[in-house]
UniProtKB/Swiss-Prot annotation:
Originating organism: Saccharomyces cerevisiae (strain ATCC 204508 / S288c) (Baker's yeast)
Main location as per UniProt: Golgi
Subcellular location as annotated: Golgi apparatus, trans-Golgi network membrane
Biological processes per GO annotation: retrograde transport, endosome to Golgi
Protein name: Uncharacterized membrane protein YHL071W
Length: 532
């Protein structure tokens, strides 16, 4: 087998880095790799090592007592040192009778992998020596081998196996990549402190937003209640993910309880994604900002579609986790295709609704609300730009590396590209979004703003009873002032008599005034007239 194909095989293995401390291998899938930290780089209670446990062995010929499994443990940088290239271009990996006849190995190494002290790099054609030791042995008996591979430096280590004497023999074994800090895979080690930080950050944001909601509980919009519930949900979801990595680090990934817990987290992850899409769709439709309430039929359709998307997402994640990663099956498409269609539908509906809402606000000259939606669009574009920027930077970081160096370094930053970076971007976007729609003493005026539509066709979209009820809820918490109530009463009369007339409530008309809706302007003017 050519070394180029061997390198490509390990490159594919890197794309599916072991998701835990232990990995199963057999006669069909006989290679496995994982990053390992030295005790100096990531301190812990034990010295890191790699061990091999043979669980099953089915001999092709029961009379052949010498048959077993050949094992080699090595640093990936030294993969060229395994095997010897023959004159015909093929590579002889195992020290068998043929290799002994050619003098490629000694009798004491029979059944083991052939190791070369010096090798030629296929990319640079330069000779180089071993950077780390290569452990090779044979095993015929079931159980854990006495020989373990000690990790003295941080690197990407691999275990390759082969059944010697007969290629038709079957076996099953477990490789234990034991790091100093615990059972968690090295590529996920930093997820524990990262998710701990995110859990604390979400908890702080939830406390702050809860305090604002309690402080302005009589002026809350329905949308702000949605955001509060979502804050609590995101905090719980992040804590559960953090606890998952802590449990896996302590117990390993082989327990049934951990797999059940993984399904539970999948449900939460599906809820997080679905709730995000639903919230974005409701805002794009103008819920709570442009209109105090949406049409009941339209709102029900959004909720039903969100529930359907949630069910499809849960089915996809459960199928993904329950399916054996070694068995490539197209059955995953049964749930993957509907999920992609649902996500595309959400994406299309959100953008089209956002465009219609902004067009409507522009036609009605509702400048304040239009600016809020513009900020939201800008925030979405910036978040996408940051996501792609992180991907671009990570890509260029590996441009100057050769294939071996890239494989050696990728596992250290893989979690940043696929998990941490999107999680941090999502957190920042959500915090900024929640800040835009935070509860204030005047935030309820966004829903009952007097900067109303000027066409009679849209009158039905604004329920004056909702406006009055919102105003009545807020007034008891303020000192009773007859002139304000008189002004509010006259305002309703003006709205009922002539809907096209814009009331005298100013929506940031003064360049030096930072107040969104100055509800005291007319009252002060009226008092000035009465004094004169």
């Amino acid at each position: 087998m050519d070394r180029t194909w061997l390198l490509l095989t390990w490159l594919l293995l890197l794309c599916g880095v072991v998701q835990g401390n232990q990995e199963s291998i057999n006669q069909k899938y006989h290679d496995v790799c994982s990053g390992m930290y030295s005790k100096e780089d990531f301190n812990g209670k034990v010295d890191p090592y790699i061990s091999f446990t043979l669980e099953e062995l089915s001999l092709a010929d029961e009379d052949d007592d010498g048959e077993g499994v050949s094992v080699a443990v090595f640093d990936f940088q030294d993969y060229e040192h395994i095997g010897v290239r023959l004159p015909n271009g093929e590579i002889q990996y195992i020290c068998d009778d043929y290799a002994l006849d050619l003098g490629l190995c000694e009798d004491s190494s029979e059944g083991q992998f052939i190791i070369q002290e010096t090798a030629i790099d296929p990319f640079t054609s330069k000779e180089h020596k071993l950077t780390s030791q290569i452990l090779t042995f044979t095993q015929q008996e079931l159980g854990t081998n006495d020989k373990v591979y000690s990790i003295n430096k941080t690197g990407y280590y691999c275990v390759t196996t082969s059944s010697f004497i007969s290629s038709s023999s079957k076996f099953k074994a477990t490789v234990n990549f034991r790091n100093a800090y615990g059972q968690l895979d090295a590529s996920e080690a930093y997820k524990m402190p990262i998710y701990a930080f995110l859990a604390v950050a979400y908890a702080v944001c939830t406390l702050v937003y809860s305090w604002l909601c309690w402080k302005h509980r009589h002026e809350l919009l329905p949308l702000q209640r949605y955001i509060l519930v979502f804050c609590i949900f995101l905090t719980a979801d992040t804590i559960f993910v953090w606890m998952y990595y802590i449990i896996e680090n302590q117990k390993g990934n082989s327990s049934v309880a951990l797999h059940v817990y993984m399904v539970f987290i999948s449900i939460f992850s599906a809820g997080k994604m679905t709730f995000t899409l639903l919230l974005a769709l409701l805002i794009s439709l103008g819920y709570g900002i442009v209109y105090p309430k949406l049409d009941r039929t339209l709102l029900r359709r959004c909720q039903i579609f969100a529930i359907f998307t949630f069910a499809v997402c849960v089915a996809f994640l459960v199928q993904k986790y329950s399916q054996n990663s070694e068995s490539l099956s197209n059955l995953i498409l049964i749930t993957a295709i509907p999920l992609v269609l649902c996500l595309f539908a959400f994406y299309y509906l959100t953008l089209s609704s956002m465009n219609k809402t902004m067009t409507y606000l522009r036609e009605q000259n509702q400048v304040v609300k239009l600016n809020m939606y513009r900020k939201l669009i800008i925030l979405c574009y910036i978040s996408l730009f940051i996501l792609f920027l992180g991907l671009l930077v990570s890509t260029f970081a590996y441009v100057g590396m050769d294939t071996v160096d890239m494989i050696e370094q990728y596992w250290k930053t893989e979690f940043l590209i696929t998990d941490t970076w999107p999680s941090f971007v999502y957190f920042l976007v959500f915090v900024i979004f929640a800040f835009f729609w935070r509860p204030t003493s005047t935030s309820y005026l966004l829903a009952c703003s007097h900067q109303l539509p000027t066409d009679m066709e849209n009158v039905s979209e604004f329920d004056l009873d909702d406006i009055n009820s919102l105003s009545d809820e807020a007034l008891p918490n303020r000192e009773p002032r007859n002139d304000y109530q008189e002004h509010d009463h006259n305002m309703d009369i003006d709205l009922a008599s002539d809907f096209e007339e814009v009331p005298s409530v100013n929506a940031n008309t003064n360049a030096n005034n930072d107040v969104l809706f100055d509800v005291d302007y007319d009252r002060d003017a009226k008092n000035d007239r009465s004094t004169t």
